[in-house]
Amino acid sequence: MNIHEYQAKALLRSYGAPVSDGRVVLKADEAKSAAGELGGPLWVVKAQIHAGGRGKGKFKEPEAGEKGGVRLAKSVGEAAELAKQMLGRTLVTHQTGPSGKQVNRIYIEEGSDIARELYLALLVDRGTSRISFVVSTEGGMDIEEVAASTPEKIVSFSVDPASGLSDFHGRRVAFALGLEGAQVKQCVQLVKNLYRAFVEKDMEMLEINPLIVMTDGNLKVLDAKVGFDNNALYRQPDIMALRDETEEDPKELAASKFDLNYIALDGEIGCMVNGAGLAMATMDIIKLYGAEPANFLDVGGGATKEKVTEAFKIITSDPNVKGILVNIFGGIMRCDIIAEGIIAAVKEVGLQVPLVVRLEGTNVEKGKEIIANSGLNVIAGDNLSDAAQKIVKAVKG
């Protein structure tokens, strides 16, 4: 789960991280009073969406102006006008895709005198099962370009969970960032605070870009992006309260309410599978035979007719889907239950695209019999390869 920048900064502030004072604005008429509560003489007006690249982004609507989603104002009135221009508009960045995201929140914060822009992130390194630090002296809007063209400017290391974080980790970050004097001590404390927040709040990713050195020599968190482990949210009610469902894919949101693991992709063949490994194998074989999967959808081991029906609704709500492949291995899940769910779903949604079903495992013969006697136009797949070839042929011809 992701949260907005202003929420991330409030969380980090509670852990002692140095951040600018700011105000969130939901309505245009709130902007002037919000900006007036801040000191100036420079105000930063930021669009709040769950995507990076806001500074280099562009709005679809000409009324929003030609600048990106991060703008500078030199007066309260100008800050209010910039907020008014961006609220309700659609911001397109390299992370949103061409459809962009609607800006429903604006964050106005005090400007900072910047001497240097740095990069600092904490990530879960799944290869080592440790928390890793990733740091660079080249922070700011071009960090992706730095990673691609000059990777030697990025330093990373992990923390052994058995021994935990120590001061030397903070000093290692400081030296990698080229900090000196009192800045090293500040960095050591900041690293401690960020690491504690990361662990206590079950984060998956914490990105500070940029971490700035101000002209007075002090450090400040200028932007923050935080992602949390969805599997740990049950023990983080305060984090769950920060969830903004308007920022989530509607199909993924609907799937989560039925405990379906769904991720939208860009292809034309919808997939419904039980088990993450089998789902990935199904997507691979669709690509092998010349097509592209439209989604990852794992119905899990305890799917009911209701869950299967909802899964079909979610898949068919994607206008790019030109065919559907159902691939079920019945272990915990019985194939006859899945078959009943498929029939009910096809009847309820009025399926208009080809459907190939491959069943194997517990009660597979009952499942096949239910589908065969349904009177519906469902194509049976004898095995995974056969099913994949049939759905690709049905879609591509």
From Swiss-Prot:
The keyword Hydrolase does not apply. Residues 9-254 form the ATP-grasp domain. It holds the Pfam family ATP-grasp_2. Pathway: Carbohydrate metabolism; tricarboxylic acid cycle; succinate from succinyl-CoA (ligase route): step 1/1. Substrate binds at residues 274, 331-333. PROSITE patterns: ATP_GRASP, SUCCINYL_COA_LIG_3. Succinyl-CoA synthetase functions in the citric acid cycle (TCA), coupling the hydrolysis of succinyl-CoA to the synthesis of either ATP or GTP and thus represents the only step of substrate-level phosphorylation in the TCA. The beta subunit provides nucleotide specificity of the enzyme and binds the substrate succinate, while the binding sites for coenzyme A and phosphate are found in the alpha subunit. Its cofactor is Mg(2+). Gene3D superfamilies: ATP-grasp fold, A domain, ATP-grasp fold, B domain, Succinyl-CoA synthetase domains. Mg(2+) binds at residues 209, 223. Keywords: ATP-binding, Ligase, Magnesium, Metal-binding, Nucleotide-binding, Tricarboxylic acid cycle. Its EC number is 6.2.1.5. Belongs to the succinate/malate CoA ligase beta subunit family. GO terms for biological process: succinyl-CoA metabolic process; tricarboxylic acid cycle. This is Succinate--CoA ligase [ADP-forming] subunit beta. Binds 1 Mg(2+) ion per subunit. InterPro entries: ATP-grasp (IPR011761), ATP-grasp_succ-CoA_synth-type (IPR013650), ATP_grasp_subdomain_1 (IPR013815), Succ-CoA_synthase_bsu_CS (IPR017866), SUCC_ACL_C (IPR005811), Succ_CoA_ligase-like_bsu (IPR005809), Succinyl-CoA_synth-like (IPR016102).
